[in-house]
Amino acid sequence: MLIILAACQSQAASALSPTNTPTPNPTTQPTVTSTPTPTASPSPSATPAPTLFPLPALDPQATLAPCEKRRPAADDLLAEVSDNYGLDPNYVPGDLVKLGNYLPGRVTLPDMLLRQPAAQALGKMVKAMLADGLAPTVLSSYRSYFDQAVAHNRWLVEDPANANEISALPGHSEHQLGTVVDFGSPEIPGLTGSTTAPFSPLFDQTSEGRWLAKHAFEYGFSMSSPPGAQLLTGLAYEPWHYRYVGVEMATYLHASGLYLDQYLFKVRPVMPCLP
């Protein structure tokens, strides 16, 4: 955001209207006052995005650990995981819970896992969606490093040219954080003409996709990879992929038009780890 400080100077000019009153003889010659030289306005300067939310302290002088050894703190909902920044293969969140305790069976498989704060918020959001007559499904949630390796290898076989854009490399998937959900919609087959491809950019045209784009932030969820995010996330547009970041952050991202990786890129003083 550019803040331009401009100095405004008002000038008033007076004119004497002719009347029938005799003009008095001039007295002392008025002193001519020199016009002040206008002060140059300050050059516009970029103002950094405000750090509205606490981030884990990062010492610029500290030796950064390799990403393959990184384990986010338990209270860190904003850990950056992308094409560049990964996680320890053995990292498993400590508060994973079964979604079957929070969601109806028609929405998801009961043994799917998510971190407890995300699961609680998801339960409230899905309840609201069902009350609005929608039929969301949760197709994917927490994925371990090994699970992501299996998924990625499958895409390497099915679509090797685009596999890295479709599926994150193991250790570089937000799903390993345990705060991410992939949604489905019963309207997808009618839009894509396929019953075997549950994920599609056309999800944003479904009733569920439109509802999430409008309301997910109210429950603390934010779309991780919106259009144009591939430069930072490494992934193509994924309108079905939502990450729990907390209500305050999700509200800020929604209002500002930013996505999480973009926000972190603006405010982090140093890299979170060595790629």
Show the residue positions of the predicted features:
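C-terminal motif of bacterial Sec signal peptides marking the signal peptidase cleavage site
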Residues: 4-7
